[in-house]
Swiss-Prot record:
Post-translational modification comment from the UniProt entry: Contains an active site 4-methylidene-imidazol-5-one (MIO), which is formed autocatalytically by cyclization and dehydration of residues Ala-Ser-Gly.
Organism of provenance: Staphylococcus aureus (strain MRSA252)
InterPro entries cross-referenced by the UniProt entry: Aromatic_Lyase, Fumarase/histidase_N, HutH, L-Aspartase-like, Phe/His_NH3-lyase_AS
Cross-link 5-imidazolinone (Ala-Gly) residue location(s): 142-144
GO biological process: L-histidine catabolic process to glutamate and formamide; L-histidine catabolic process to glutamate and formate
Modified-residue entries (2,3-didehydroalanine (Ser)), positions: 143
UniProt-listed CDD domains: PAL-HAL
UniProt protein name: Histidine ammonia-lyase
Taxonomic path: Bacteria, Bacillati, Bacillota, Bacilli, Bacillales
Family membership: Belongs to the PAL/histidase family.
Protein's cellular compartments: Cytoplasm
GO cellular component, one term: cytoplasm
Amino acid sequence: MTLYLDGETLTIEYIKSFLQQQSKIEIIDDALERVKKSRAVVERIIENEETVYGITTGFGLFSDVRIDPTQYNELQMNLIRSHACGLGEPFSKEVALVMMILRLNTLLKGHSGATLELVRQLQFFINERIIPIIPQQGSLGASGDLAPLSHLALALIGEGKVLYRGEEKDSDDVLRELNRQPLNLQAKEGLALINGTQAMTAQGVISYIEAEDLGYQSEWIAALTHQSLNGIIDAYRHDVHAVRNFQEQINVAARMRDWLEGSTLTTRQAEIRVQDAYTLRCIPQIHGASFQVFNYVKQQLEFEMNAANDNPLIFEEANATFVISGGNFHGQPIAFALDHLKLGVSELANVSERRLERLVNPQLNGDLPAFLSPEPGLQSGAMIMQYAAASLVSENKTLAHPASVDSITSSANQEDHVSMGTTAARHGYQIIENARRVLAIECVIALQAAELKGVEGLSPKTRRKYDEFRSIVPSITYDRQFHKDIEAVAQYLKQSIYQTTACH
């Protein structure tokens, strides 16, 4: 597969396909023409010795300091080196790769004044899978993701660390190995690389992909639990959900009916009891609301993936050109979206933990043994798996605190409101990792409960899932180190998203 970039039409589905295949990036000719035109504007500014922020002046509080024309390129190199203040663990390889794609895509809109050499260097790094090592901490989310993107830029100029073919190396060594020159930044290009929201947006894209997948995975896991508790099928009838008219809720109900079709373990209203608890009866309403959040997040991310979020921005109208200092680098729209994503994923974990509690609690699980123990008393069974799930969902409640309302002033009060969008992105991904483990715990417990109930009664679709996951997690016939089972299932759930990941 080839991913064609034009600065206008990039989607999350394209990104997902790119990550699943050994894809290459190609650039549409019209986009390259826009790059050339915007660069010509920068060259005219230099030739005419105009005063334009970030091209002929310093940055931030130093925006009124005029730079000597002989030092324009040095200014850009200094910018990258001084702003590379990222700290902590690096972003994943997937996030770093998507970050480069997004930065390239925004340059192709033709409002940043980048050279074709910069564009081609980014394309080269992407296609050769030279992955910059980019620390996660250090961004305020306005003026964009300065610190993370500076580490990306360091790799392009041969001064950063990269992962190449599974090894951590100096980018200069990799470029030499591939007979490629480090990029020599020209006027405006350092700013064009780091003024933007690509760190938070790239992490947001990966988080969205994994969150959506968790939403679908949670349905078949819930269907296993539903059958193990002889859940009532009537609550999923189409007419119940059609009268509320939330499409995502309607869709979840339809998928739950599909997962449960043919089961002899489900029951009808008043057959055993009149109503189920909310965590079974309200799966379409709860999960559907999470999908509503995911759809909003996707919309915001795709707007930003195709946005010009540099500063200043270069425009051409008729025969006139002008350069405007604005604030498109401010990450507030993405910060809000990613804070919402945290809520949607946290609720999937919350309701999963409550379902698995019903499977192990002898007061709630019908005729199943306490904690599904093979020998109650001597064997503890799934007792502490529920503890672990409770710990994770409680941690998520702390992580779900909105980062986007926690502004702090910076740059001598010039940058006096920031988005903290990258913090929202980082915390959001930790919530996803936690939620995946909670669902893995529910899966391990639901597999055992279904076995005790009699797998011959499972619906055909959930029976296939049972057989698939029993190859990973054996029956609980005695107490063992269940953390190994939980991590094995969590990893398997994640690998189903990135079956053949392009950056590995």
